[in-house]
């Protein structure tokens, strides 16, 4: 306030007054020194701390971005590996199914061939048995016929009757 009164008493504000300039400069320097001692250090410290905090945040953000990109690359690689693995498993499954199908088909074919062979063998055995039975019957008939021929006289008419009788016996046994 004292300064304001001095300025007003001295005249115009635009007129240079050396005393006023001197005291203004001294006051400015004193305020500057006081601020430097008291406030300048904490203000600069706070600004530096703020700058360090901002730089740290930027560095962390870049680090997080790089880490996220690395994780993304790793996830893509893992996904590609998983897809390749699933393709391999599917391919192996199909190959295994084809192999099993071929084995089952081969086994069924082998079994059917065995069954056909067994059936043929059984048919052949039945055929042999039937032929054996037929031979035995023919032999019996021949023996009976020979027996009848020997018992009967050997004239032609008797022989014809014996043969007709044997044929009749044979036809009755077949039916």
Swiss-Prot record:
Role, per record: F(1)F(0) ATP synthase produces ATP from ADP in the presence of a proton or sodium gradient. F-type ATPases consist of two structural domains, F(1) containing the extramembraneous catalytic core and F(0) containing the membrane proton channel, linked together by a central stalk and a peripheral stalk. During catalysis, ATP synthesis in the catalytic domain of F(1) is coupled via a rotary mechanism of the central stalk subunits to proton translocation. Component of the F(0) channel, it forms part of the peripheral stalk, linking F(1) to F(0).
Keywords for this protein: ATP synthesis, Cell inner membrane, Cell membrane, CF(0), Hydrogen ion transport, Ion transport, Membrane, Transmembrane, Transmembrane helix, Transport
HAMAP family documented for this protein: ATP_synth_b_bprime
Residue runs in coiled coils: none
Family that this chain belongs to: Belongs to the ATPase B chain family.
Lineage: Bacteria, Pseudomonadati, Chlorobiota, Chlorobiia, Chlorobiales
Membrane protein topology class: Single-pass membrane protein
Protein name: ATP synthase subunit b
Subunit structure comment from the entry: F-type ATPases have 2 components, F(1) - the catalytic core - and F(0) - the membrane proton channel. F(1) has five subunits: alpha(3), beta(3), gamma(1), delta(1), epsilon(1). F(0) has four main subunits: a(1), b(2) and c(10-14). The alpha and beta chains form an alternating ring which encloses part of the gamma chain. F(1) is attached to F(0) by a central stalk formed by the gamma and epsilon chains, while a peripheral stalk is formed by the delta and b chains.
Localization per Swiss-Prot or TrEMBL: Cell inner membrane
Domain of life: Bacteria
GO cellular component assignments: plasma membrane; proton-transporting ATP synthase complex
Membrane-spanning parts: 20-40
Matches recorded under InterPro entries: ATP_synth_B-like_membr_sf, ATP_synth_b/b'su_bac/chlpt, ATP_synth_F0_bsu_bac, ATP_synthase_B_chain
CDD domains (alphabetical): ATP-synt_Fo_b
GO molecular function: proton-transporting ATP synthase activity, rotational mechanism; proton-transporting ATPase activity, rotational mechanism
Gene3D superfamilies: F1F0 ATP synthase subunit B, membrane domain (1.20.5.620)
């Amino acid at each position: 306030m004292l300064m304001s009164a001095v300025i007003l008493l001295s005249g115009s504000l635009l007129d240079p007054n050396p005393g006023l300039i001197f005291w203004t400069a001294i006051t400015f320097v004193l305020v500057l020194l006081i601020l430097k001692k008291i406030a300048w250090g904490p203000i600069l410290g706070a600004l530096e701390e703020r700058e360090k905090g901002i730089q740290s945040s930027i560095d962390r953000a870049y680090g997080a971005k790089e880490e996220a990109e690395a994780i993304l690359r790793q996830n893509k690689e893992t996904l590609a590996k998983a897809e390749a693995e699933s393709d391999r498993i599917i391919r192996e499954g199909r190959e295994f199914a084809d192999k099993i199908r071929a084995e089952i088909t081969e086994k069924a074919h082998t079994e059917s061939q065995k069954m056909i062979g067994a059936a043929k063998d059984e048919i052949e055995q039945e055929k042999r048995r039937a032929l054996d039975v037929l031979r035995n019957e023919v032999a019996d008939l021949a023996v009976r016929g020979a027996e009848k021929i020997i018992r009967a006289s050997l004239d032609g008419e008797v022989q014809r009757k014996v043969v007709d009788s044997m044929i009749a016996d044979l036809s009755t046994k077949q039916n």
